[in-house]
Amino acid sequence: MPTYLSISLQYLTIRNYDCCSYDFSRLFEKTPRLRKCFISSNSDEDDDLPISREFLPAPQSLSVTRLILLSIRSLPLMTSLFKLLPSITRLKVEIYSITLDGHQWKEMIVNYLPQLKDFQFKIDLDLCRSIDDSTNEDKVDQYLSTYRTSFWIEHHQWFVRCHWSQWNEYLQISVYSLPYAFVYFPLFDNDHNYHTKSTCSSDIHHSYDSVRILGYEPWMFHDEALSHIQLINIEKLSLQLPIDQQFFSIIPKLENLLSLTVAIPTENHRLQLQALLDRAPRLFSLAFKFCVTSAMPPYRYTSSSICRLDLQGYDPSRRRHRYDIRQCMELSRSSIGIQCRILAIEVEKPKCILQLIYSMLNLRTLHVSYENDKRSNQYDLVKVLQHYLPSTWSITRFCYGHIIIQS
């Protein structure tokens, strides 16, 4: 936290900070012209230290009008922060494991954030113990009713959607404001049997344009309420081939895609991957998570934009792909291999490392895994590589079995 007064600082980002209420008091004391604050908190303790107003200017002189809070796990800490910032007009908050309903939100907003106009939030929590589908739905309806009051619907026109499912004997829910405002798509992992409801009219389709990261699964969009969604700004995507017919209605364009991780369980779907590559002109990184071993990736795919390859995938037996000398040569001669600047790969022999370095002319960073790189070896692999490679290459052992080589 700052120890000197700053009269010029207007925008501040604090990431992964384990903080308490008193820290915030000192922060705002030292930054009287702060307008926007982004805080990502690591704290999950019930910090309930009293807020001392003498550390602060008068409330009406506080300049912060926009606040973004991510990974919040302490209700007292969040409430203390709201008390310090009564001039907030725009609030975005992501909360985990805190049970908050619409009535509690209303009380905090009325008491501490009277000027709030734009409110975006997402809460993931275990609502109660799961009993059966009918009882679970009743519990969700009771919870959602707190967001259907005149304060939410008429006065502010703030609407929410809720997903719920059973997980480890608990009724797990995710509730968020509409339009959706966060980077990750708001569904639980492997949650094939989720249900969803909203406080807005069923014929209103709100935007999910903020979503940048998606692990695509067809079951995610089986509910009618989500089947009309379009995710037009995806930057990081993972999926398994073959993709279904619904994929391109959900993700109609891939112009913004930068990173793709793909699983290919059979060889019959290679053309489908090439079709995806053809639609992604800005794709920088391609990773193979799982694929058949009759031919090692990246096969014969082409893409003029890919500069990073991650070939450390698995075969159907959950064994990591290991490239031999011949396969390394084929890789270096492939279209994507020729233009590759960053490569992650596992090799069978140290000679493969030299083969890659000398034959991939555009390569600048190599993350290489070699199972037999062990402390007990007679010859240290790093020293061997230093002997055979030009001095322009730096060699770092991240750990035994994983070496990073850069030029």
Name the predicted role of every residue range.
Residues 1-407:
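Eukaryote-biased activation of long, low-complexity terminal tails and linkers
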